[in-house]
Amino acid sequence: MKSLLDLFKQFTPDEHFDAIRIGMASPEKIRSWSFGEVKKPETINYRTFKPERDGLFCAKIFGPIKDYECLCGKYKRLKHRGVICEKCGVEVTQTKVRRERMGHIDLAAPCAHIWFLKSLPSRLGLVLDMTLRDIERVLYFEAYVVTDPGMTPLKKFGIMSEDDHDAKRKEYGDEFIAKMGAEGIKDLLEGIDIDLEIEKLRGDLTGSEVKVKKNAKRLKVLEAFKKSGIKPEWMVLDVLPVLPPDLRPLVPLDGGRFATSDLNDLYRRVINRNSRLRRLLELKAPEIIARNEKRMLQEAVDSLLDNGRRGKAMTGANKRALKSLADMIKGKSGRFRQNLLGKRVDYSGRSVITVGPTLKLHQCGLPKLMALELFKPFIFSRLEQMGIATTIKAAKKEVESGTPVVWDILEEVIKEHPVMLNRAPTLHRLGIQAFEPILIEGKAIQLHPLVCAAFNADFDGDQMAVHVPLSVEAQMEARTLMLASNNVLFPASGEPSIVPSQDVVLGLYHATRDKINGKGEGLVFADTGEVQRALDAGQVELHAKISVRLTEWTKDKASGEFVPSTSLVDTTVGRALLSEILPKGLPFSNINKALKKKEISKLINVSFRKCGLKETVVFADKLLQNGFRLATRAGFSVAIDDMLVPPQKTEILARAEAEVKEIEQQYVSGLVTAGERYNKVVDIWGKAGDDVSKVMMDQLKVEKTTDRHGKEVNQESFNAIYMMADSGARGSAAQIRQLAGMRGLMAKPDGSIIETPITANFREGLNVLQYFISTHGARKGLADTALKTANSGYLTRRLVDVTQDLVVTEEDCGTTNGSVMRAIVEGGEVIESLRERVLGRSTAEEVLHPETRAVLVPAGQMLDEDTLEELEAAGVDEVKVRTALTCETRYGLCAKCYGRDLGRGGLINLGEAVGVIAAQSIGEPGTQLTMRTFHIGGAASRAAIASTVEAKSNGVIGFNATMRYVTNSKGELVVIARSGEVIIQDEHGRERERHKVPYGATLTVKADQQVKAGTILANWDPLTRPIITEFAGQVKFENIEEGLTVAKQVDDVTGLSTLVVIDPKRRGSAKVVRPQVKLVDANGAEVKIPGTDHSVTIGFQVGALIQVRDGQDVGPGEVLARIPVEGQKTRDITGGLPRVAELFEARSPKDKGMLAEITGTVSFGKETKGKVRLQITDPDGKVWDELVPKEKNVLVHEGQVVNKGELIVDGPADPQDILRLLGIEELSRYIVDEVQDVYRLQGVKINDKHIEVIVRQMLRRVVVENPGESGYIAGEQVERSEILNTNEQLQSEGKIPATYSNVLLGITKASLSTDSFISAASFQETTRVLTEAAIMGKRDELRGLKENVIVGRLIPAGTGLAYHQARKAKEAMDDAERRAIAEAEAAEMATTGSDEAPEVEGSGVESGSAE
């Protein structure tokens, strides 16, 4: 009876497991899984379609073909369940057991598992300490291996060829045992004493680095075997498991042919070869034949496990490689990525989208037919409830006939039932949002215009998918978390995502502009109603300046009530009418200006902060409706006459032509080199283009009009094109410049700039040549888009993979660490203010008033807009805030360190998957940036080179600590510091701006000088880098020999010659010398550096043009040589995306700069061929030296004092060096700034937090330096949380903890080295990850999101985190309860011996509360 009852139990998958372990199966284990041995290669009988007995599809082994029916048909139906038919041997049960029952094949000869042999590093090789080549020779029967040397001088593990073996046999007879094939290897593996080996190796971790490394590797593998209890000999198979037949199906096609899984072919080969080998062994066939068969069997097993890993892949009849077991799980179309991480789902549909301007923000229009199909089950159940249909079949009929009652039910079912809309590619979480469906006629989904920005959707044929959340929980989550009206901010930056665009912006902008002397100017109105009547009557026009009495509502801080205040406001008609839609609590001043796109965005942001979510959504909807209406009423049009070509254009072009001619002249007379000429020409044209566009915009911007007094005045233009660009609705100054200015410089396909620009614009029209030049850019744009979209997607995938397990797991980790934030100032401009950087972060320590030292903000408080206003008022210029990097939570992050949830506006909630959000925020713009290249049409967007710096504000000049300069003969101050900066301070001594000044620049200000804004502080030649002398003297050339170190360049045009330093590789002699200049004084003695006995030596690097003659007198600050700077390539995100990937992969840049390893004094040691020896001596006299290639530019000179981590050889910094020398905080700052630079160039806002989260994940592993009394090996990489836990335990036991140093891993490396093998295997290199995990017998704790998705549990984030925590708490309680009951029972039995069951009180209550 019990078994019958089991039938009705719903089969529930047991998801209450908390970890998964992977290991290697022993032969006993494989046999215990198996339901029988597969002896024959036959599959199914092609006539009867019944499986052959003992074959690959045998029903006796694997289970019946039809539910509850044996093969011969003797037993049918449920009553016989569990009976085994005596005729055909088949158990009567469900067919689905054919998906889970395995078989096995007993191999006649052992076979090595190819993964452990060939997946590098070869595990077999490590365990046996043999080379892969040797093991392969043994396994594939090319050589013998000695398994037992006996009394002979042969070595165990020794390899010998066939001939050697024969000779040794003759010599020693049967004294020794040597074997071939997997048997030999198996014997060796069985003979290994793991404990002994480990002890030997532990004692042997000394000696040369190579040896230590090798031993450590072996040690690791052996310890893994020991820990996991796996025996090494299991790497060689005696029994091969056979996959259940329904997982490798064989389907009859019509026409008597079969479609089969490749695995069946591979299994057939193994079985065939195995039975043949068995027969040969029984017949005692000659050794050589049996050997060949064993080799073939080994190859067949290899192919089954991983086809193509060794030798040529086995092919089927159609010459294509067969898909082996390994291929089934790896790659994009393998099990992990195809079926476990990306499933297709039921209850979904897709259709084209069109605009739904009448919808509210939380609604979408759903076509009736789609809704009918999607909500079918709901309709069926309702039909049954109402008694209209009795069965599902009847209900189906009813729905298909489409009676009116069905449509009524559909309306009812759909009410309050949100659906989710998704637009591919889903680049961030706003790519899926929930809406309430509104039934519409037609076949297209209607989408609210305001959510288009978040979906990145437009209506040119985009399609979207609809998904129905079925369960009540799913509906609730969709409604509370995913509803479009709850997602009004971008999670990347905290900016509003529901900002109107295009026509709406144009309508609002047009309506809020003001006009001089408009009709009705100066009238005063009582209220907006009166304004509306006057406008309708034609008494005033929309742009007229008027005064209106308006009532504003402000929130009373004490009571929280809104109090009205009425006043007369000067405004325009359009703005006054727009004021009616303002939510309470938003002052009118917010819309009393021309509403451009930025202003509207700010308006929505302010509304969100001041009035809350609900009001803002309503307000945004109203703005949208009004914008559409106003844009329609405005009657915009664009005519060719709106593109005004400036009359000054011809004059500017003529001037540029003249300048170019002059440069050509200078080139001809040899004053400039070819490279300089090109650079200067490109610069002239770049400037000319900018000038044209400036005068064009100036002309478009204003128009003349007469005011009330009849005077002619300028006012902002109402030109349609100008208004579109100015409002931010469509187009930009760059595009208008191409329409009405000049197209300007174009780039060649390789990115270099063509020096003749296109002087025409689109209004004038291009000639054939100009058109041809511009096709380069357009095509490059299209090609780039295609390539880079893929790259960007891959970057996002790697980012998500490295951060997917980072979730907010606790409120506060209690750390006091943090990082100090200041405003970012570059080139004198504040790029990012302090406010933008610290908004929404928590303070790490108290913020004090700079003057009174009063506490403004306590530690651990989140900084919001209001607090920051107070800080700004107090003049605070730096704040120490908590960051994701300094958070001390073990698994995950704490809410305090993360700060504000940018997508919601409050402190982040527990369970928020901040890792994935960070990855999406960085990856999403990547794709957009990549698609942005060709909009400019390849017009070369070359950054105009700066050649001066000017003060932006008034103040006092100061210089930074490293600034040094000399005064030259003209009395100018010449900078000779590599990292000099000019600082301007205000009257309180607070730094206002800071400018980098390059080496060789001329300073035009002195220290402590008062300057006004606009003063030029320094200037320099941007196209060359000078080499300057600091001291006076007479030039004495050394090693400057023509043909050896310098070449005379004679210009073919001018006949003039200059000396150019040439590359040492091209010099004739072997002795390498560095061309340099020494200075001698009047007496011929060498000039020394003051305070030392080093003589002044100035070296020239390759490519320098020497400007002085031997014996010439020079003064300080004079230029000895110039190095031309190569022409810049156009800056495009092309440089950007790879740059971001390079930073996150932590690659060492090529030609990287060198940082000083220690603090000390620089000197140059003995040179070698092609290299300079650079030495730094620290105060204790410790010397660090390094050889630097001569072509590198050394930034330091003899006797200079450098600090640890300072750049001493020019080039990009290596993040690994920064981490090693300057620490985590500097590294984080470097990566954040570099990544932000790339995005900022494209005008993309991303919060620093997201980048920090990624950096935290890149730093999550550490290298053990001194293992102490832990079980680690020095040099081993461990998860940071793991070593912290171990150390805590060691310290509590009074043992010596391990010491470790930080290590920076690239994102790919970090994803692969995660503790979760499931996540790593599904990312990349599946084989390697699984092999390693199997040997170590790894446990996956299922901490990350990916692992849980793969095993089909709720993810431990969001509501899932709460679910898992509650479940664990309940389990712990249940355990405690069970124990208590057991104890109580035991006590009861002991005391009374009565048989009454003890009552347990409150048990139900307790377990309920845990939920």
From Swiss-Prot:
- Looking at the keywords, is Chloroplast present? no
Q: Which UniProt keywords apply?
A: DNA-directed RNA polymerase, Magnesium, Metal-binding, Nucleotidyltransferase, Transcription, Transferase, Zinc
Enzyme class, top EC level, equals transferase
> Which GO biological process annotations does it have?
DNA-templated transcription
- Cofactor(s) for this protein? Mg(2+); Zn(2+)
Q: So where does Mg(2+) get bound?
A: D458, D460, D462
The UniProt entry's sequence similarity note says: Belongs to the RNA polymerase beta' chain family.
- What's the protein here called? DNA-directed RNA polymerase subunit beta'
Organism in which the protein naturally occurs: Paracidovorax citrulli (strain AAC00-1) (Acidovorax citrulli)
